[in-house]
Design a protein with these regions (language model features):
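Active-site microenvironments that recognize anionic phosphate/pyrophosphate groups
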Residues: 1-230
Length: 231
């Protein structure tokens, strides 16, 4: 059993290296961060590998079996986001790379940022793949219809736990920039793998990110860095 968990850790690190989330020089650091989150005091490198996101699911299974988390959708999401945070580049690294690529081409920069948002599992590709989408002709022209199935139904246990959880008021909402790196609660999603790009709008600091639910292709969000009512 424990060897399969070591293999899952190795596989997650391999995935992070292959898609450019993690530099090989950071592998030991990131491995130790993962072992800490899993409360593992030992480790042996394994030769077998597990595909992503299966390796992440195995690590959540292990945490549930060890009593570290409850085996519910919300708690698994909180935990696997913590794990992905261990292999996601720091915000400053992402910002530097984005603007470096932007000097070459704005498209290169946004393509990089969108891919990173998927690779770090902020946009969960496996769930987005479940969405239904088609077009139909109407008298007004071609209409695109989509059914969002990627946002999972809430587990009754999570609903009950959320009712007992007192709201902290921080972050003030799901779109506040203070969500970057936030550990989350049973009623507020974890965001250790969220990265927000600083942009300037009318001389004011705003943030640019991609939506995790992809209601349409490359669904982007630009929000004020100050919590203000949407009008």
């Amino acid at each position: 059993m424990i060897r399969s968990i070591y293999a899952a850790v190795d596989s997650l690190l391999g995935y992070a290296k292959n898609c450019g989330l993690m530099d090989a020089l950071d592998e030991t650091f990131c491995r130790n961060a993962l072992l800490s989150e899993l409360k593992l005091e030992s480790y042996e490198k394994q030769s077998n590998s597990v595909d992503f996101p299966d390796c992440l699911n195995l690590l959540c299974d292990y945490a549930a079996e060890q009593g570290q988390i409850h085996d519910t959708i919300a708690e698994r999401d909180l935990f696997d986001t913590r794990l992905m945070g261990c292999v996601t580049p720091r915000p400053s690294e992402v910002v530097r790379k984005f603007w470096s690529l932007y000097q070459e081409s704005p498209k290169k920069a946004t393509d990089y940022f969108y891919k990173l948002s998927q690779d770090c599992n902020y946009i969960r590709r496996d769930r987005i793949a479940k969405d239904e989408q088609w077009t139909t002709k109407t008298k007004y022209g071609e209409l695109e219809i989509s059914i969002n199935l990627s946002k999972p139904e809430k587990d009754p246990r999570d609903i009950a736990a959320a009712k007992l959880k007192k709201a902290s008021g921080y972050p003030k909402c799901l779109l506040c920039v203070e969500n970057v790196g936030y550990a989350g609660t049973i009623s507020h999603p974890a965001r250790q793998n969220l990265r927000v790009m600083p942009v300037t709008v009318n001389g004011q600091p705003w943030g640019f990110q991609y939506s995790p639910y992809v209601y349409y292709n490359e669904h982007a969000i630009v929000m004020n860095t100050q919590h203000t009512p949407m009008v």
